[in-house]
Swiss-Prot record:
It is a multi-pass membrane protein. Disulfide bonds: none annotated. Belongs to the transient receptor (TC 1.A.4) family. TrpV subfamily. TRPV4 sub-subfamily. It comes from Rattus norvegicus (Rat). Keywords: ANK repeat, ATP-binding, Calcium, Calcium channel, Calcium transport, Calmodulin-binding, Cell junction, Cell membrane, Cell projection, Cilium, Glycoprotein, Ion channel, Ion transport, Lipid-binding, Membrane, Metal-binding, Nucleotide-binding, Phosphoprotein, Repeat, Transmembrane, Transmembrane helix, Transport. This is Transient receptor potential cation channel subfamily V member 4. ATP binds at residues 192, 197, 201, 236-239, 248. GO terms for molecular function: actin binding; actin filament binding; alpha-tubulin binding; ATP binding; beta-tubulin binding; calcium channel activity; calmodulin binding; identical protein binding. It catalyses: Ca(2+)(in) = Ca(2+)(out). ANK repeats lie at residues 237-266, 284-313, 369-398. The ANK repeat region mediates interaction with Ca(2+)-calmodulin and ATP binding. The ANK repeat region mediates interaction with phosphatidylinositol-4,5-bisphosphate and related phosphatidylinositides. It is found in: Cell membrane; Apical cell membrane; Cell junction, Adherens junction; Cell projection, Cilium. InterPro entries: Ankyrin_rpt, Ankyrin_rpt-contain_sf, Ion_trans_dom, TRPV, TrpV1-4, TrpV4. Residues 666-685 dip into the membrane without crossing it.
């Protein structure tokens, strides 16, 4: 039964009006615009009604004005969009515009009417035929509309994070048999898919389209390909969605990607991810684990190495052979904050690798350059990481084999530490950290790194064992060789042609001197070849700075050998070569000044002035000389071939410079200009100048620019260089002193190196497999007033007691406390230098706090002896 409140029902064949007021407010079912589209069809100009329409009886709906009359402006030519008139007309209708959507969501939108500019057809309305309509029949469902997606539309949707706009994407892909990894959905320049695009456009760390995209990729059957699709351009080549999720610090997306099969060993090798010195911006080791470590995300590091899906192998190396530890060393910059997190992450990874892979030590892995993380830290000057590695002390028994520092014994503030010398001092078997620090001149702070314990004490021990004696023997030997060379050159015969006969005793002494000089030249030749071309750390800068004396010795040896060859060949020009060798040989004696602190900085000053200040001065001065010489020589009158005779016609000569200009005038004039620069020249050539005024003007400007300006600038620059070297004289001498020690050690054969090797073989605990952990260690005795011996993992309970251990089946006894050197005291009390064979000095400890402690006074023995240890 019909409700009495219902409005009048339309007659069959009429269009029912919706209930409500005349203004068209919504009170019933809205008139769909898709049905309105059926009203317009036919050709242009067909405006008459059909016979059926003309003959139908009038109904209640006929009181409504004609549609063409109400839309008379919408059917005219030039009106682009009839929907504007539809929205602005006063026609009482319930047609409501649909919600506005993005322009690239689909090609058709219910609730709106779009008129494409290319479609210029005029429409006429179509008469709606009378259809019997059941009052309770459900409204017909609109036909399903298939949206169209392309790369711009898809990238715009994921950038906005709109999941609703992704409705229909799966149907579109399945219908057209497409996938999200197809080329049409990739960025042409980079090969980027929509997943990295979504990860790069997060809002508060989230983008709701990411799970939807992964679900669609799973349903289309290319989940792994979609997740692991890398960038393909040269700039970001190899980067995947997992790299981006880690860089954006989104652990939830990292977990989601790994759970769906992301490659945890994908390598980002693009130019952007290269070191700065190679044109890159941020090098992190290419691998996702290295990226998480280098961006200080320990929670992601733990997940990548311990997740149940696919664990990241911590031993994996990148294209440079670097592990995650190498990558951490590479990003260190010696600042406090950076060093703190790098060292903490370094220990976390090292200990984790030891627990996951007990048979492997991540710290011993070498990269393509043959460098371990410790060597890399030394070569790049990362002093914070370097000091942390060599002084690392692990107290946990399970991972104590990773320690490089062990406390042998402790008593109060005094403790004796054993430092592992592996990689630090290798006795020539392989590249050592000590050689890298000394011979690599690219390290600006290497003098600071040489002061780090145990490097500092290791150098002192080498100097005491063999360095000092060998150095002074070399000094005496070289001076004797140069004296012999000088006497041999001074007493060379002046008559006859070489080789000269040997008849008298003086001649035989000269022969002995020549043989000794030739042998020393050959010896220097081969040793210089070994040092220059077989050095472990070669380089042009290292050659001219650190290896300058080796280069000079090489030139000296070549001159000596060439001079001897010319002498034996009977060429008198051997004398010219010999005198150059003689001068260079005496200049090379400056090398031995580095053994003394008072004279060690002079050679450095000379090197810096020669290669820095004097080189720049000579470059500018040479340009000035050539320019002024060319101009002044041009002003001289050319010489003629006519002879000029005296008044009595007795002395006739052809005029030459300085009276005129001939072919050799330019070179002679350069020498005269140099004399003017140092204030020794004359003006004899002025009389032969064509324009004397111009000639004098040029000479005056030359003297002002060179003698007054350039020379004084050179003096000022040299004074500044000397001042800088003097400020750093201690560090510079320490570096030269270390270079001298290593030069002496490298000149020894292998068996002598091992005989003079510093340190001792010590059992420091148990290795990972339970066997005794025996290492070559170096002992450093230290004093620290700010940290006391509580809960220390010491080896010996009795301070200073001898330890007897077995080594290759033989019994060896370690010496007692060999060096009672108190260093690193905070505050520093005193520094002791051990004198071999004598008692140690008294250490005054008065006025260091309250002498009474716990009701009694604690004191120290008046003398601290190596034989009477402990205290």
């Amino acid at each position: 039964m019909a409700d009495p409140g219902d409005g009048p029902r339309a007659a069959p064949g009429d269009v029912a009006e919706p209930p409500g007021d005349e203004s068209g407010t919504s009170g019933g079912e809205a008139f769909p615009l898709s049905s309105l589209a059926n009203l317009f069809e036919g050709e242009e100009g067909s405006s008459s009604l059909s016979p059926v329409d003309a003959s139908r009886p009038a109904g209640p709906g006929d009181g409504r004005p004609n549609l063409r009359m109400k839309f008379q402006g919408a059917f005219r030519k030039g009106v682009p969009n009839p929907i504007d008139l539809l929205e602005s007309t006063l026609y009482e209708s319930s047609v409501v515009p649909g919600p506005k959507k993005a322009p690239m969501d689909s090609l058709f939108d219910y609730g709106t009417y779009r008129h494409h500019p290319s479609d210029n057809k005029r429409w006429r309305r179509k008469v709606v035929e009378k259809q019997p309509q059941s009052p309770k029949a459900p409204a017909p469902q609109p036909p399903p509309i298939l949206k169209v997606f392309n790369r711009p539309i898809l990238f715009d949707i994921v950038s906005r994070g709109s999941t609703a706009d992704l409705d229909g994407l799966l149907s579109y892909l399945l219908t057209h048999k497409k996938r999200l990894t197809d080329e049409e959905f990739r960025e042409p320049s980079t090969g980027k898919t929509c997943l990295p695009k979504a990860l790069l456009n997060l809002s508060n760390g989230r983008n709701d389209t990411i799970p939807v995209l992964l679900d669609i990729a799973e349903r289309t059957g290319n989940m792994r390909e979609f997740i692991n699709s890398p960038f393909r351009d040269i700039y970001y080549r190899g980067q995947t969605a997992l790299h981006i999720a880690i860089e954006r610090r989104c652990k939830h997306y990292v977990e989601l990607l790994v759970a769906q099969g992301a490659d945890v060993h994908a390598q980002a090798r693009g130019r952007f991810f290269q070191p700065k010195d190679e044109g890159g911006y941020f090098y992190f080791g290419e691998l996702p684990l290295s990226l998480a470590a280098c961006t200080n995300q320990p929670h992601i590091v733990n997940y990548l190495t311990e997740n149940p899906h696919k664990k990241a192998d911590m031993r994996r190396q990148d294209s440079r052979g670097n592990t995650v530890l190498h990558a951490l060393v590479a990003i260190a910059d010696n600042t406090r904050e950076n060093t703190k997190f790098v060292t903490k992450m370094y220990d976390l990874l090292l200990l984790k690798c030891s627990r996951l892979f007990p048979d492997s030590n991540l710290e011993t892995v070498l990269n393509n350059d043959g460098l371990s993380p410790l060597m890399m830290a030394a070569k790049t000057g990362k002093i914070g990481v370097f000091q942390h590695i060599i002084r690392r002390e692990v107290t946990d028994e399970d991972t104590r084999h990773l320690s490089r520092k062990f406390k042998d014994w402790a008593y109060g503030p005094v403790y004796s530490s054993l430092y592992d010398l592996s990689s630090l001092d290798t006795c020539g078997e392989e590249v050592s950290v000590l050689e890298i620090l000394v011979y690599n001149s690219k390290i600006e702070n290497r003098h600071e790194m040489l002061a780090v314990e145990p490097i500092n004490e290791l150098l002192r021990d080498k100097w005491r064992k063999f360095g000092a004696v060998s150095f002074y023997i070399n000094v005496v030997s070289y001076l004797c060789a140069m004296v012999i060379f000088t006497l041999t050159a001074y007493y060379q015969p002046l008559e006859g042609t070489p080789p000269y006969p040997y008849r008298t005793t003086v001649d035989y002494l000269r022969l002995a001197g020549e043989v000794i000089t030739l042998l020393t030249g050959v010896l220097f030749f081969f040793t210089s070849i070994k040092d220059l071309f077989m050095k472990k750390c070669p380089g042009v800068n290292s050659l001219f700075v650190d290896g300058s004396f080796q280069l000079l010795y090489f030139i000296y040896s070549v001159l000596v050998v060439v001079s001897a060859a010319l002498y034996l060949a009977g060429i008198e020009a051997y004398l010219a070569v010999m005198v150059f060798a003689l001068v260079l040989g005496w200049m090379n004696a400056l090398y031995f000044t580095r053994g003394l602190k008072l004279t060690g900085t002079y050679s450095i000053m000379i090197q810096k002035i020669l290669f820095k200040d004097l080189f720049r001065f000579l470059l500018v001065y040479l340009l000035f000389m050539i320019g002024y010489a060319s101009a002044l020589v041009t002003l001289l009158n050319p010489c003629t071939n006519m002879k000029v005779c005296n008044e009595d016609q007795s002395n006739c000569t052809v005029p030459s410079y300085p009276a005129c200009r001939d072919s050799e005038t330019f070179s002679a004039f350069l020498l005269d200009l140099f004399k003017l620069t140092i204030g020794m020249g004359d003006l004899e050539m002025l009389s032969s100048a064509k324009y004397p005024v111009v000639f004098i003007l040029l000479l005056v400007t030359y003297i002002i620019l060179t003698f007054v300006l350039l020379l004084n600038m050179l003096i000022a620059l040299m004074g500044e260089t000397v001042g800088q070297v003097s400020k750093e004289s201690k560090h510079i001498w320490k570096l030269q002193w270390a270079t001298t020690i290593l030069d002496i050690e490298r000149s020894f054969p292998v068996f002598l190196r091992k005989a003079f090797r510093s340190g001792e073989m010590v059992t420091v605990g148990k290795s990972s497999d339970g066997t005794p952990d025996r290492r070559w260690c170096f002992r450093v005795d230290e004093v620290n007033w700010s940290h006391w011996n509580q809960n220390l993992g010491i080896i010996n309970e009795d301070p200073g007691k001898s330890e007897i251990y077995q080594y290759y089946g033989f019994s060896h006894t370690m010496g007692r406390l060999r060096r009672d050197r108190w260093s690193s005291v905070v505050p520093r009390v005193v520094e002791l230098n051990k004198n071999s064979g004598t008692d140690e000095v008294v250490v005054p400890l008065d006025n260091l706090g309250n002498p009474n402690c716990d009701g009694h006074q604690q004191g120290y023995a008046p003398k601290w002896r190596a034989e009477d240890a402990p205290l």
